[in-house]
Structures are given as C-alpha cells and as structure tokens.
Curated annotation (Swiss-Prot):
NCBIfam families per record: MenG_heptapren, MenG_MenH_UbiE, PRK00216.1-4, PRK00216.1-5
Catalytic function, reaction form: a 2-demethylmenaquinol + S-adenosyl-L-methionine = a menaquinol + S-adenosyl-L-homocysteine + H(+)
Function text: Methyltransferase required for the conversion of demethylmenaquinol (DMKH2) to menaquinol (MKH2).
Lineage: Bacteria, Bacillati, Bacillota, Bacilli, Bacillales
Top-level taxon of origin: Bacteria
Family to which the UniProt record says this protein belongs: Belongs to the class I-like SAM-binding methyltransferase superfamily. MenG/UbiE family.
UniProt-annotated binding residues for S-adenosyl-L-methionine: T58, D79, N106, A107
Protein's recorded name: Demethylmenaquinone methyltransferase
Species the sequence originates in: Bacillus cereus (strain ATCC 10987 / NRS 248)
InterPro entries in the cross-refs: MenG_heptapren, SAM-dependent_MTases_sf, UbiE/COQ5_MeTrFase, UbiE/COQ5_MeTrFase_CS
GO molecular function: demethylmenaquinone methyltransferase activity
HAMAP family listed in its UniProt record: MenG_UbiE_methyltr
Pathway(s) this gene product operates in, as recorded in its UniProt entry: Quinol/quinone metabolism; menaquinone biosynthesis; menaquinol from 1,4-dihydroxy-2-naphthoate: step 2/2
Keyword set, alphabetical order: Menaquinone biosynthesis, Methyltransferase, S-adenosyl-L-methionine, Transferase
Length: 237
C-alpha cells in the first residue's frame, strides 16, 4: 500500500534524526546557520515574549528563540518525530534552558488556543507537511494580533544557470551525500523531492496573505536557494 505524504515524511525523519544536524551543515555548506541568524535579526525578538517553533526537529531554532526571549520568556518546540525531539531534548537539557518545552504533536492540528504566541516559526518544515495552506492558517490562528509568523525554507532560484546547477545538486548530489554521511540515500532523495516541488517566493508570499497575514516580507538567501517569509497578524479591530 502506498504511504501518504505524512507517513513517508515521518518515516524519513525518524530514520535520519541522529545524522540530521551534520547533514544540514553538509547539504547547505553551513549556510543554514547564517540564514537563521539573519532571520532572527529581522524578527527582532523581544525579551520576555512567547514563541512557538513548528516542526522544530532537533530544536536548533527553538534554542535560538529561547536565548532571544530569555529566562522570562517561553518557547515551545513542536514536532511529530519523537526521534528528532529526543535529539533536541538532549541539547536543551545540556544548555539548561528552562524556558523551553518540547512537545510531540502535529503541525496540521496545533494544540494551542487562538492568539497564544508573539512569534510562530517554521524552519525547513513547511515543505514536508501535507497541506501548506492549512499549516499557515494554523500558525496564523495561534499567533497573537500584531504577532509574527515566520517561515525559513528552501526556495526556487530564478537566476539562469544557477537554477540549473541547484536542480542538479538537489537531485543527484544531495542524495549521494546522504548515502555517504548518513547511509540514507532513499531518505535524502525524499528531501530533494520535497524541495523541488515547494512553491517559489512569490507564490509563498501570496499564500501568507491568503492565510490572513499582512505586511509580508520576503528575504532571499544565497541567490534564492532559501528564503525567509515573514507576515504579521492584523491587530484586533
């Protein structure tokens, strides 16, 4: 029987959890850290605020958010892969970040009340969910009026020549890296599939607006290999 997208993604991340951080650095040539740092600068996270990191994986962005909100703030990381969360919990415990809570849950049904968080992020996770728009609407639902919804994700480069090289890299080279470093050719083939079919920057910006967000900002990284999208939930009338 053919697996659903949700089942396949779950299997992928359960299997690659122990090598995920290393492979992130290999695949992006360490650029993912710089992309996240610049995204955090643009977000301008306020101390004492409350944040949710959806599809938090091994909790790298969750930890960055926790450091930004400080001990008086609160950060919740949510992921549906228990193995990925297990890696994240080890990091959080090592850093003694008491303001962090990691939860096993589904991005399609966020287990929170409306208007709960000041910031809701999703990093390299939106392309893996069954329904992009549904998850964006869920993120918009749980963010407070005036709060920010942020997505950092792979994108579709538009520069001629570079785009072709990017496609070749993701289709042929990245799965080989997966086989070499993580013994997971099949799983990293899935990651290139999900990246290749993900909406481009303009299309995702339109989706942010359709989800109910305004003042949408788009920031491309490394010739459009990745991009940040940030939208604000309208203030209550």
């Amino acid at each position: 029987m053919q697996q659903s997208k949700e089942e396949r993604v779950h299997d992928v991340f359960e299997k690659i959890s122990d090598k995920y951080d290393v492979m992130n650095s290999v695949i992006s040539f360490q650029r993912h850290k710089a992309w996240r740092k610049e995204t955090m600068r643009i977000m301008d996270v306020k101390p004492g605020s409350k944040a949710l990191d959806v599809c938090c994986g091994t909790a790298d962005w969750t930890i960055a958010l926790a450091e930004a909100v400080g001990e008086q703030g609160k950060v919740v990381g949510l992921d549906f892969s228990e193995n990925m969360l297990s890696v994240g919990k080890q990091k959080v415990e090592a850093l003694q970040l008491k303001q962090v809570e990691l939860l096993h849950g589904n991005a399609m049904e966020l287990p929170f009340e409306d208007n709960t968080f000041d910031y809701v992020t999703i990093g390299f996770g939106l392309r893996n969910v069954p329904d992009y728009m549904h998850v964006l609407k869920e993120m918009t639902r749980v963010v407070k009026p005036g709060g920010k919804v942020i997505c950092l994700e792979t994108s579709q480069p538009t520069m001629i020549g570079f785009r072709q090289g990017y496609i070749l890299y993701f289709k042929y080279i990245m799965p080989l890296f997966g086989k070499l470093f993580a013994k997971s050719y099949k799983e990293y083939s899935w990651l290139q599939e999900s990246a290749s079919t993900f909406p481009g920057m303009k299309e995702l910006a339109n989706m942010f607006e359709k989800a109910g967000l305004e003042r949408v900002q788009v920031k491309p990284f490394t010739f459009g290999v990745a991009a940040m999208h940030l939208g604000m939930k309208p203030e209550s009338k």
